[in-house]
From Swiss-Prot:
Species per Swiss-Prot/TrEMBL record: Dictyoglomus turgidum (strain DSM 6724 / Z-1310)
GO MF, one annotated term: rRNA binding
Domain S4 RNA-binding: residue ranges: 98-155
Description of how the protein assembles with itself and partners: Part of the 30S ribosomal subunit. Contacts protein S5. The interaction surface between S4 and S5 is involved in control of translational fidelity.
Pfam families membership: Ribosomal_S4, S4
Family note: Belongs to the universal ribosomal protein uS4 family.
Name of the protein in its database record: Small ribosomal subunit protein uS4
Ribonucleoprotein is among the record's keywords: yes
Amino acid sequence: MARYTGPDCRLCRREGMKLFLKGTKCFSEKCPFERRPFPPGQHGRAQRKLTEYGLRLREKQRAKRIYGVLERQFRRYFEIASKGRGVTGERLLQLLETRLDNVVYRLGWALSRAQARQIVSHGKIAVNGKRVNIPSYNLKPGDVVELLDKDLIPVQEAISVFGNKSVPAWLELDRENLRGKVLRLPKREEIDTPVQEQLIVEFYSR
């Protein structure tokens, strides 16, 4: 399966904001974005005014990079969202938020979505009692997510960093047994991802 293998910090610089792709490094002085908060490349510092198309493209790219999704899969999410009930942009974000890797991240079991993706891929997560190793697996209200290896070092590190940080209202977390539950689909105001989803809708609807 295709995936991005370049430097994650380069993506943050390209989008002009921290995407928090590298866990604790993003909060430290070692974060390259702190030292070079401008796009990579020879002309990175140059001020360029984006066209309407450019603005929509950047918003789409930002969302893809935050959730770690490549173009083909992202477009498929949009097509599903556009055919479903409700507001297309909000539905798109709901599909991205209910990915298994994102829920593992939201529950505080990983320092980044990339780390959560690895935990899922290695078969450390069960959904409704069955092992699932597909990061893109979409969860539904009522689904129960459980960590199979509760002593996994990356998970323990994430728990120590996040502490008792509250989880989103649409999720329920049993901290003692490391078990989570999807209570319902998230509302738009409960999704803190810094994207303007309407621009993404306009990009694909052009």
